[in-house]
Amino acid sequence: MKKNKYEIDMCNGTIMDKLISFSLPLMVSGILQLMFNAVDIIVVGRFSGSQALAAVGSTTALINVFINLFMGISLGANVLAARYYAAGRDREMSETVHTSIMLALISGVVMAFVGVFFAKGALELMDTPADVIDQSALYMRIYFMGMPFFMLYNYGAAILRAVGDTKRPLYFLIVSGVINAGLNMFLVIVFSLDVAGVAIATVVSQAISCVLVLRCLYKSEGSYQLRFSKLCLKKDYIIPIFQVGIPAGIQSTVINFSNVLLQSSVNSFGSIAMAGYTAANNVLGFLYTSVNSVTQACMSFTSQNYGVGKYKRMDKVLIDCLILSSGMALVMGGGAYLFGTEILQIYTGDPEVIRCGMEILSITTVPYFLCGIMDLFPGALRGMGCSAVPMILSVIGTVGTRIVWIFGIFPQHRSLYVLFISYPGSWIITIIMQVICYLIMRKKVYSRAAAVIKKRKKTKKPRKTAE
């Protein structure tokens, strides 16, 4: 299979250097996406005050609840495309691409409708304080108008990841990120649009990245070339995409629902604590992006090797991913803890907001490598096409632990520090369950593979010998 300069051969050669080549652009891309929100927060916090900062930050968990189901489906598209691409099944690859892009378009339109019409009601259910709820609702409504662009970009980038191309999505985000930062400063400082200004800047930047990734697919050669006339919804591809993607999306949605409960608990401390959580949560978002880039690599590498039957190599992929993810998280988490005060000062100059933010970072940053380990095992299983059981275990381990903590322990010991102990506690419990699940399901996958190989050997015709 001929590969262009952007693609990575995931099925041959050494693994670690290819994981780094795949993960590093993906991590930087994720950081740039976070920068869209970070620049929003920094500009609002510095030029519009802590109330506007709380208004923008209080929407994060709620926005994630709305979009993660549909974003999870993009993981299904990534897994299916990687499998067909590695196996050289060009027709199936092309139809996966066109079905995925159509799903993205429909998902984006649905999310735009939901966000615009139900934003304020959802914020009221979260007990968002009266002094920020109108600004929060305005930010959400404008933000959700850009959902079609957001979905199309992410589904398009998922297709490129499937073939090992993480560099071009990075280039697209650099362009859109610079435009986002410039528009933020212009609309907030010059026109004093506050939360509306940062939301408009985000939508415009998402539209630009969407156009760039679709243009890239349109101009590509081979099986993942996009032709708008071929957009379709084919049952044979929707079902396997949903089998992997919907459980992943449900998992993200339910976990973010637990974060909404967490946000509600933070809201009970007032707008200062909300602003501190907003800044601290943005820092944690950068840590998550680093470990999630390795999880994405694990899923794509596993899926391609699964597609060509290289099962032993899948074990090596997981081991190298565990080493890479843990190493990055320990370095970045340790740095975030040691320099937390200085980092939070970028977001706000209010000492009380910084104090609240540091209270959260002090318990969540150093053990963040556990979050990476927790995600890698279900990521490897999704690469094999197994998604439902890891989803159930993640929901039980992560959400169950946090709900018990929020309603059982936290009311007796009300502080931000105690509230956020639920993070590392839920990671440890979930890791134990996911490791057991992985070992059991890996054994089943290997047994099926051995049975197929044995059957092939039996059906081979013996060579005729000369009489």
Where is each model-derived feature located?
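Hydrophobic alpha-helical transmembrane segments in multi-pass membrane proteins
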Residues: 22, 26-34, 71, 103-112, ...
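Short runs within selected transmembrane alpha-helices of multi-pass transporters and secretion channels
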Residues: 74, 143-161, 169-177, 198-213, ...
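Hydrophobic transmembrane alpha-helices of multi-pass small-molecule transporters
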Residues: 65-68, 180-185, 210-214, 286-289, ...
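Transmembrane helical elements of multi-pass membrane transporters/channels
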Residues: 21-40, 142, 176, 205-209, ...
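Helix-terminus/linker motif at the lipid-water interface of multi-pass membrane proteins
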Residues: 35-54, 123-130, 186-195, 253-286, ...
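Residue-level signal for short hydrophobic patches within transmembrane helices
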Residues: 12, 16-35, 39, 62-69, ...
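Small-residue-rich hydrophobic transmembrane alpha-helices
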Residues: 53-113, 150-169, 276-334, 338-340, ...
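Short alpha-helical transmembrane segments in multi-pass integral membrane proteins
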Residues: 1-23, 81-146, 188-246, 302-367, ...
